Regions:
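Nucleotide-activated chemistry modules centered on ATP-dependent adenylation/adenylyltransferase
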Residues: 1-176
């Protein structure tokens, strides 16, 4: 099974910069771009996504946590959580509107997910508990944390690792 390479566009500067960086640095890498639409994005966010689509020459998939509802996804889940707003202690917004739609989008395919978190940011970022998703943080000085390395090197991940190493070897042999 072919490894999918995906990159999420949040609407912020870091994910946009990462998309541009990856296109310039790895022009032959077939990256799928996606965004998780909460229904509460600013018009400027949608404009950024459109501008990136034009620059990248690819459609950015719009993932919505609630497909068959007259409400936008945020309002839908706000009602489900009894009007309780998300916070750093209750991250239902991140889980329901971003992580779950992303994991549904990639399914069980082997995936390398590129995440635009800088090395100076004091947060881990998304590291999936699903064995088929490997998160990589190209803007970090230390790209992989210890738990990611341990996860990546498990025997159950051998086929995914073999495919990644083959793709790196092909790139190295072609002089990139």
């Amino acid at each position: 099974m072919k490894t999918r390479h995906v990159l999420g566009i949040s609407g912020g500067k870091d994910s946009a910069a990462l998309a541009i960086y990856m296109k310039k640095r790895y022009p032959t890498l077939d990256i799928e771009y996606y965004t998780c639409d909460t229904g509460k994005e600013l018009d400027e966010t949608y404009q950024l996504i459109e501008n990136l689509e034009n620059y990248l020459g690819k459609t950015i998939q719009k993932l919505r946590a609630v497909e068959n509802s007259h409400e936008d996804p945020f309002d839908h889940f706000l009602k489900r959580y009894g009007g309780f707003l998300p916070s750093s202690g209750s991250r239902w917004c991140t889980k329901k509107l971003k992580l779950e739609p992303f994991e549904q989008y990639v399914g069980s395919d082997p995936v390398v997910s590129y995440v635009g978190i800088r090395g100076n940011e004091d947060r881990e970022g998304y590291i999936s508990k699903k064995s088929n998703i490997q998160s990589i943080f190209p803007f970090r000085k230390n790209i992989w944390s210890e738990d990611v390395v341990q996860k990546a090197l498990t025997n159950s991940n051998r086929d995914v690792l073999t495919e990644i190493y083959r793709s790196i070897d092909v790139e190295a042999r072609s002089g990139r």
